[in-house]
Amino acid sequence: MPFAQVHYPFENREWFDNHYPGDFIVEYIGQTRGWFYTLHVLATALFDRPSFTSCISHGIVLGDDGAKMSKSLRNYPDPMGVFDNYGADAMRWYLLSSSILRGSDFAVTEEGIRDTVRQVMLPLWNSWYFLSLYANAEGKSGKVDFSSDNVLDTYIFSKLHHLVNDTTVSMDAYDLFNACQQVRTFLDVLTNWYIRRSRNRFWSGDQQAIDTLHTVLDVLTRVAAPLLPLITEQVYIGLTGNRSVHLTEWPVAADIPVDNELVIVMDLVRDVCSTTLSLRKSHSRRVRLPLASLTVASPLALGLQPFVSIITEEVNVREVKLSADVAGVARHELQVVPAALGPRLGSDTQKVIVAVKKGDWKQQGEVVVAGGYELQPHEYQLKLLAAVGDADTTASSALPDGKGVVLLDIALTPELLAEGTARDIVRIVQQTRREADLGVSDRIHLILGLPEDVAQQVAPFADYICAETLAERLSYNADAPRTTDLDGTPIYVAVERLR
């Protein structure tokens, strides 16, 4: 933006005409008057045009004590220590994804940088490691291919389409904060939904699954490269063997297939599962313990029918019931926003507040009327509250964004408890396999030492235990020393590789 530095107008007139006004400028918020404003005044006076077209005004970087970062106070993590322990990408992402790029002050802490590694960098790296592990185990390699019609593949491609589209919009607007949030959200879907739900396909060497994850990582590394330049470079080179992710073209959303109806339904499936798992946690029902039933009431409930099996597995219930009758199991609660009502209604705002408290309001289609006043969308919040049933047998909660409610049967029976114990044994055996450094496809001889009551309890689930742990032989040794804890009960677990 400064023109004197290029000796304008005595030299470089053509260069200046092609480079002014500037595309982008960034300074901390204290330069609003001293720099941003001054540049515009000069440009307007001399050229009758703005000095720049886009601007980021960041906040003040604070130390971990909340005071302004200071060399004399040393109130910040040692930069070289941060780079050595967490990498430069961690610091870069930590700042780009923070509120500092939206003008807020921001305290830099080592804990926050460490969270970046856990929440962003490790999921990306682990996704690549997972693909390479199972592809190599089957002697297969992946390729870019969007042709799979598997429902999970279609879903992750659709989410990838939206990631590319939304991140492109954010980047074009210099909104790095939103770009980071979009990448973080996609990584959560990729690792905690797509990969986890597709594990059996990778175990069996499904080429479509391998190609899909290869394709997703190819596009994802290119999208995230400006934000995480080092780790995306290593993942991309390992994935493709090409020279550099930074020499590739930016992805185009139109090249990626999308099924928006599937996205709506599958996002609802994920909301149902996460809400139900939260209910389990709050009522001390561990995930491996099966429960009798889950009821989902939502206007979109019938669209969930093809995915009932997924919900059943995710939340570990015997039966999923779907209902479009939300009113029968939930009610709406209206909350007005006085700060938004005041400028329009003045002293009548209090009348609306009193009317809402008395229940004198109604919803007519998309319109909400309270105390005789029609409310504007920004003047209220309409929350869906699940009806409270028998607290000993039923747990309920509303879904995000008022999409419906879930009701979970939390009553326990001896049969459910027995299956839960079998699932706990599977978890312990899997941990034992890892400690024995067994390969993911190694078959085993499983030896268990269980108290008599536990052995009788899990006997009907012997085939399940063997299938889940790749055990081709199952033996019992009642006299073996029981040093492993099974929910407070000591048991014995040993594994032997068969091949």
Predicted regions and their residues:
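Feature 926 captures the class I aminoacyl-tRNA synthetase adenylation module centered on the KMSKS loop
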Residues: 1-2, 46-88, 107-108, 112-499
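Short Ser/Thr-interspersed hydrophobic loop/turn segments at strand-loop and sheet-helix junctions
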Residues: 38-45
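Acyl activation and transfer enzymes in specialized metabolism, enriched
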Residues: 30-34, 422-423
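An acidic, gly/pro-interrupted, aromatic-rich
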Residues: 70, 100-101
